[in-house]
């Protein structure tokens, strides 16, 4: 990855993709941003609009492109796919989005792309697993937004409950980005002090913590029911991961990472803290879990693996499962 000229390709310029592109421009990340979208006119419009914004942020080439732009990209961010609708779970999107990911991944890899892939399309854990298998890229270079957004939501909820800044809370949501996720309360801290100790001192019950966990789990549905989609939160998570990659930060972030032995789980993608730098994921941070959390991690992994296996088989990707 060149330090002097970094190129990002965005695939999918919908609500999330366009919000991500705007965040990228606002942060002055990368010198080149290519936007690939089914509707070329929309991508051209966004590119022209974002180009104006660069005058006030940092010089950047922003333009509409096709998949050939991926050939020399440092990072390709995939936001394309069918969006979650009111009443749908993320896992309801498996079939149609696996088919879309199959075509997108093959098109990207046909260009000779050898950078890092970052995914946000749901169900993101299942799709990232499939994309890694199809691409043949090292698992360390195929990452998803994972539970980064869920962890942010947890920190916000806890901050409101405790009357502190979310910046001073260290707490992770883990496993699936979806209905089987859980809050790893046993390792959470507030200003360095164990969260559970603070809750005991303040009379905050376990039931209250489980209610917060459930609210975090369902926050996306609340947003979708009101405005039809989520975009700003996940786009900002993608920007944060992008910054860690392009600036080689060695930042510990909750992402969707390949798990192969950690937590007693093999060959899966799950939300967990990991060290992110210019090589992608340099290390998975295996968080100590209590019995409840460990069981939740295992159950989530088993459910996701079955969905991935069944889904990939149905769309003709069974041969990739043995790789």
Swiss-Prot record:
One cellular-component annotation, GO: cytoplasm
Signal peptide positions on this chain: none
Main location: cytoplasm
Catalytic activity: (S)-lactate + NAD(+) = pyruvate + NADH + H(+)
Cited InterPro entries: L-lactate/malate_DH, L-lactate_DH, Lactate/malate_DH_C, Lactate/malate_DH_N, Lactate_DH/Glyco_Ohase_4_C, NAD(P)-bd_dom_sf
Record's keyword terms, sorted: Cytoplasm, NAD, Oxidoreductase, Phosphoprotein
Top-level EC class: oxidoreductase
One GO biological process term: lactate metabolic process
List of residues binding NAD(+): 16, 37, 81-82, 120-122, 145
Record-listed substrate binding positions: 84, 90, 122-125, 150-153, 230
Pathway membership, UniProt: Fermentation; pyruvate fermentation to lactate; (S)-lactate from pyruvate: step 1/1
EC number of the protein: 1.1.1.27
GO terms for MF: L-lactate dehydrogenase activity
Modified residue annotations for Phosphotyrosine: 221
Pfam family, one: Ldh_1_N
Active site, UniProt feature: 177
Entry's localization field: Cytoplasm
Quaternary structure annotation from Swiss-Prot or TrEMBL: Homotetramer.
Family: Belongs to the LDH/MDH superfamily. LDH family.
PANTHER family: L-2-HYDROXYCARBOXYLATE DEHYDROGENASE (NAD(P)(+)) (PTHR43128), L-LACTATE DEHYDROGENASE (PTHR43128:SF16)
Primary role: Catalyzes the conversion of lactate to pyruvate.
Stated name of the protein: L-lactate dehydrogenase
Source species of the chain: Limosilactobacillus reuteri (Lactobacillus reuteri)
